[in-house]
Amino acid sequence: MRSNYIVIEGLEGAGKTTARQLVVETLQSAGIHDMVFTREPGGTILAEKLRSLVLDIQSTGDEVINDKAEVLMFYAARVQLVETVIKPALARGQWVIGDRHDLSTQAYQGGGRGIDRTMLATLRDAVLGDFRPNLTLYLDVTPEVGLQRARARGELDRIEQESMNFFNRTRARYLELAAADPSIRTVDATQPLDAVARDIRATIAQWMAEQAA
C-alpha cells in the first residue's frame, strides 16, 4: 500500500496520544513500520518557535494576540511542516501520523473564534492547495470531559484556558465538518478506553480495506 497521511484530531483531553499509539499498533500489525510522527503547531525549528509564541500564556506578556494574527501563525507553522517534513516523508514512501492538522484551524478558529469561514477556506487553499490528509480520526469528546482530563495533566496552555462556550462552538464545528467529509471518521472518545481502542482499530482496519479494494 502506498504511503498515507493520517491525522488525529479532537478537543483537549480527547486522547490523541493514546489514539496515536493504537494507530501505530494497527499499522504495524498490517506490516507497515516506516512512519514519521508530527504535531501541530510544531515539528520543525520554526514551527516549534511559533507553537511557543501562540500557546504559551507568557509569550506576549500583556499583549493580546489578535485572532487573525493567531490564524496566520498557525498557518505559517503548518506550511513549514508540510513542505519540509510531511511531503518529503510521503515522497520517500513513509507513512505520516499527525497530531492535528488543518481541521483544527477550521474548528477552533472558524468555530470557537467565529472567524469568517470563507476567509479560512481561502487562506487554506492559497497556502496548502489541494494537500489533505488521506484519513482523519476525529475523537469526539464533550468539553466537560475533555477539559477535566486536560486539567488532570497539569497547567493549561493559552487556548486550553478558553471558555466552555468556546469549546462547545469548536466541537459543534468539528462535528459539522466531520459529517460533510468522508475522509474524516468519528470515534466516540467518551467511552471507556477499551471501547475507544476497539473502535479506533476497527476504523483503521476498515479504512485500509477500502483503500485496498
From Swiss-Prot:
Catalytic activity: dTMP + ATP = dTDP + ADP
EC number: 2.7.4.9
UniProt: ATP binding residues: G10, L11, E12, G13, A14, G15, K16, T17
Keywords: ATP-binding, Kinase, Nucleotide biosynthesis, Nucleotide-binding, Transferase
UniProt cross-references to Gene3D superfamilies, sorted A to Z: P-loop containing nucleotide triphosphate hydrolases
EC top class, as a word: transferase
Cellular component aspect of the GO annotation: cytosol
Biological process according to GO: dTDP biosynthetic process; dTTP biosynthetic process; dUDP biosynthetic process
UniProt xrefs under PROSITE patterns: THYMIDYLATE_KINASE
Any GO molecular function: dTMP kinase activity
NCBIfam families in the record: DTMP_kinase
Function as written in the Swiss-Prot or TrEMBL entry: Phosphorylation of dTMP to form dTDP in both de novo and salvage pathways of dTTP synthesis.
Similarity comment: Belongs to the thymidylate kinase family.
Annotated protein name in UniProt: Thymidylate kinase
Organism: Klebsiella pneumoniae subsp. pneumoniae (strain ATCC 700721 / MGH 78578)
